[in-house]
Structure formats: structure tokens, C-alpha cells
Amino acid sequence: TYSGNPIACAAALGTLDTYKEEGLLTRGEELAPYWEDALHSLKGEPNVIDIRNIGLIGAIELAPIPGSPTKRAFSAFVKAFERGALIRTTGDIIALSPPLIITKGQINE
């Protein structure tokens, strides 16, 4: 089994050390309001039904295309991928969770 594997535990501890040394969790807290404002600025855009978030995790619900559920979100996925961004879709919802090292400039993009 992989439970309690010493190598995996060492990697996890190293990751936690990096989070602490680089202040990544604090950085996430500091960027959360900026992220929220940027995300919610999309309200009123065509086909946007709802926007929700907590911290640096967000979701944009899109109006489904009649007779083609999930197509609108999948099209957004493809366009984002072509531009170098990775998003996740569930139905007609786009899920976003940027890395903790994201900059305000990158959020603006």
C-alpha cells in the first residue's frame, strides 16, 4: 500500500516547509479579495449565470446551450487551454483554482 510511505511523507513535509518558508498560505489569504473582485467582475457578461468563490477557488456557471449541455463550458476549456491556462469544467460550470504563486497581473489576464 501507499499509506504512510516514508518517501511520500518526506515529500509532504518538504512541501509544507516550502509553503511556510515562502509564505504561500499567507499570500493566498492576501490575494483572495483581489481574486474575488476579478472573478465577480465577470457578472453581467453574456451567458454568465452565477459566480461564486471562497479564497482562491472560484466557479463560473454558464447558461447551457439548448440541446447541447456542457458544450459552452467545454468550449471555454478549449479556448483557455489554447491560451496556456488550465481550467476544470463540470457540466456548464468552470472551476478555477490558481496556484498560490499567481500574481495580480496574471489574475488580470
Could you describe each region identified by the protein language model?
Residues 1-109:
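Conserved N-terminal phosphate-binding loop of PLP-dependent enzymes in the Aspartate aminotransferase
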